[in-house]
Amino acid sequence: MHPMLNIAVKAARRAGQIINRASLDLDLIEIRKKQQNDFVTEVDKAAEDAIIETLKTAYPDHAILAEESGESDNESEFKWIIDPLDGTTNFIHGFPYYCVSIALEHKGVVTQAVVYDPNKNDLFTATRGRGAYLNDRRIRVGRRDRLADALVGTGFPFREKDGLDAYARLFTEMTQACTGLRRPGAAALDLANVAAGRLDAFFEQGINVWDMAAGSLLITEAGGLVGNYTGDADFLHRHEIVAANPKIYAQMIPILNRYSRVHPAAE
């Protein structure tokens, strides 16, 4: 295992221990509302602090971009992108679908990825050019080649002015185009499950970089494609993502393209 990935795994497991301990008595957790339908808990903060401490002990000069504490002001060609608890709403309701997501970006390219599911003790890892793994077993995206047969994950708009009407139209189209649409509520884990072939595809708009950085590398290392709704590979800071194996990806783009908020550079 790459040494930087090894440190990220250590950090993710530390965060997972904090999350698991807290999940034993959810009534004691302090919950704060960041904005409409968007929550943060003391557990998010404690998990994030543990991750940052672990990473900074090993790599004190690396930059940090984390969901709760924001972006560090130091300049470095290495940047850790962290979501300490993706699926906070699930967590506070006791719905066991959430994860820790950690990615390392080197000169703007994601090179290391960890997504850790503390409920199942499932550890998804990837190093650029070395494949994607689930609990040390090599994983690949699914083999289905028709969107009509695909199980597709997504995320629903949950904030005001997030385009719910447009999404409702897209939801209708995609529901008719695939065999089933699922919204578990933790994008990083959804992407990891696409990499493992448990879901055939995933799409979401209004998504943040820390929700998709690690998962996107897992998918490409597992043989899949990742891009924005236009099909362009420029997605990481565009707040929209589609991911699937190459054949299903190609069938999703004509549907998603009409709903994209990204305008190609040529336009």
Swiss-Prot record:
InterPro entries hit by this protein: IMPase, Inositol_monoP_metal-BS, Inositol_monophosphatase-like, Inositol_monophosphatase_CS, Inositol_monophosphatase_SuhB
Deletion consequences: Grows more slowly than wild-type at 30 and 37 degrees Celsius, has defective protein secretion, swarming motility and biofilm formation. Increased susceptibility to polymyxin B and SDS but not to kanamycin or gentamycin. No change in the ability of bacteria to infect macrophages.
Membrane-spanning ranges: none
Substrates-to-products reaction catalysed: a myo-inositol phosphate + H2O = myo-inositol + phosphate
Any GO CC annotation of this UniProt entry: cytoplasm
Main location: cytoplasm
GO molecular function: inositol monophosphate 1-phosphatase activity; metal ion binding; RNA binding
Domain of life: Bacteria
Alphabetical GO biological process terms: inositol metabolic process; phosphatidylinositol phosphate biosynthetic process; ribosome biogenesis; signal transduction; transcription antitermination
Keyword field contains Iron-sulfur: no
Pfam families: Inositol_P (PF00459)
Compartments, record wording: Cytoplasm
Cofactor(s) of this protein: Mg(2+)
Gene3D superfamilies named in the record: 3.40.190.80, Fructose-1,6-Bisphosphatase, subunit A, domain 1 (3.30.540.10)
Enzyme class, first EC level, given as a word: hydrolase
E.C. code: 3.1.3.25
Keyword entries, A-Z: Chaperone, Cytoplasm, Hydrolase, Magnesium, Metal-binding, Ribosome biogenesis, RNA-binding, Transcription, Transcription antitermination, Transcription regulation
Binding annotation for Mg(2+): 67, 83, 85
Function: Might be part of the processive rRNA transcription and antitermination complex (rrnTAC). The complex forms an RNA-chaperone ring around the RNA exit tunnel of RNA polymerase (RNAP). It supports rapid transcription and antitermination of rRNA operons, cotranscriptional rRNA folding, and annealing of distal rRNA regions to allow correct ribosome biogenesis. This subunit may play a central role in organizing the structure.
Quaternary structure note: Homodimer. The rRNA transcription and antitermination complex (rrnTAC) consists of RNA polymerase (RNAP), NusA, NusB, NusE (rpsJ), NusG, SubB, ribosomal protein S4, DNA and precursor rRNA; S4 is more flexible than other subunits.
Protein family per UniProt: Belongs to the inositol monophosphatase superfamily.
Protein name: Putative Nus factor SuhB
UniProt lineage: Bacteria, Pseudomonadati, Pseudomonadota, Betaproteobacteria, Burkholderiales
